[in-house]
Amino acid sequence: MKGKLLKGVLSLGVGLGALYSGTSAQAEASTNQNDTLKVMTHNVYMLSTNLYPNWGQTERADLIGAADYIKNQDVVILNEVFDNSASDRLLGNLKKEYPNQTAVLGRSSGSEWDKTLGNYSSSTPEDGGVAIVSKWPIAEKIQYVFAKGCGPDNLSNKGFVYTKIKKNDRFVHVIGTHLQAEDSMCGKTSPASVRTNQLKEIQDFIKNKNIPNNEYVLIGGDMNVNKINAENNNDSEYASMFKTLNASVPSYTGHTATWDATTNSIAKYNFPDSPAEYLDYIIASKDHANPSYIENKVLQPKSPQWTVTSWFQKYTYNDYSDDYPVEATISMK
């Protein structure tokens, strides 16, 4: 959500058929599980409880960990796992289903990473809030912190997590990220220009990694790039995202937005009059193995009701997060 994290002191926080080189959007995904990869991305809205103590982070960590929607994936990318205690609890709750996990981006630069690259700083107030969990072994884990952000994003180690995952007899490379937020506090700096530079950093990393061109490379997360009303505009930021990453446009199914105040109780409380946005994606690099089909499906799972108290008033919600999860089905050749 544009500027959604500005409700307190700190903000931590593209069809274009010609760009899609896969088969028809109506193609059926392979029924061979070894040839199908299921990847989910979900921004779980776990802001620091030091700043936002009343968003049920600990309770939602348990609800998400037990939820059906997050099960039966190969890989899950988590965004906004900022709060240390709640994110540790969520990762612990997911351990049985997804025993192979990265640490949270930018929280430390220790031996939990094979490499730390980019502009990491241990003195930055907030981490990058991205982690990847996997059913399959993770052969390599790299964290990369972007060169710069704007506005309050400068106060976090935002960047991306790279994983090399071995599913049976093949390697798949999954990058999880959370790009610059749309933020009025960026001043004269355009958040869109910052996002473009961050996408270039991801693309440069992929090129320099020399990944074999017969292996799949997937990029996913909260891109903060809005698909709505942009799909048929070749000059839009949405179109530019795919061009910069040289990535295939997926088939889109499910709900028409990943953030929607008309259907989501948390989003409605925060920004009741804001238009819906489609910000979260999982896409495939065209410089590497090209999926025969890739679908992004927006799910709308409802959580059991949970209640918080603020200033002696109770507030009840029935969503896991203010963002909806996106489930990608990738048919590999």
Curated annotation (Swiss-Prot):
The chemistry this enzyme catalyses reads:
a sphingomyelin + H2O = phosphocholine + an N-acylsphing-4-enine + H(+)
Any S-S bridges, and between which cysteines?
150-186
- What EC number(s) does its UniProt record assign? 3.1.4.12
Cellular location of this protein?
A: Secreted
Q: Secretion signal: which residues? A: 1-27
Q: Which organism is it from?
A: Bacillus cereus
One Pfam family this sequence matches: Exo_endo_phos
Check the record and name the InterPro entries matching this protein.
Answer: Endo/exonu/phosph_ase_sf (IPR036691), Endo/exonuclease/phosphatase (IPR005135), Sph/SMPD2-like (IPR038772), Sphingomyelinase/PLipase_C (IPR017766)
rRNA-binding among keywords: no
The UniProt family comment states: Belongs to the neutral sphingomyelinase family.
NCBIfam families linked to this entry: sphingomy
What is its biological role? Answer: Required, with sphingomyelinase, to effect target cell lysis (hemolysis).
Tell me its cofactors.
Mg(2+)
Which Gene Ontology molecular-function terms are recorded? sphingomyelin phosphodiesterase activity
Per the record, GO CC terms?
A: extracellular region
The main place the protein resides is secreted
Tell me the Gene Ontology biological-process terms attached to this UniProt entry. Answer: killing of cells of another organism
Which CDD domains does the UniProt entry name for this protein?
nSMase (cd09078)
Q: Which UniProt keywords apply?
A: Cytolysis, Disulfide bond, Hemolysis, Hydrolase, Secreted, Signal
Please summarize the record's notes on activators and inhibitors of this protein.
Activated by cobalt and manganese ions.
Protein name (Swiss-Prot/TrEMBL) = Sphingomyelinase C
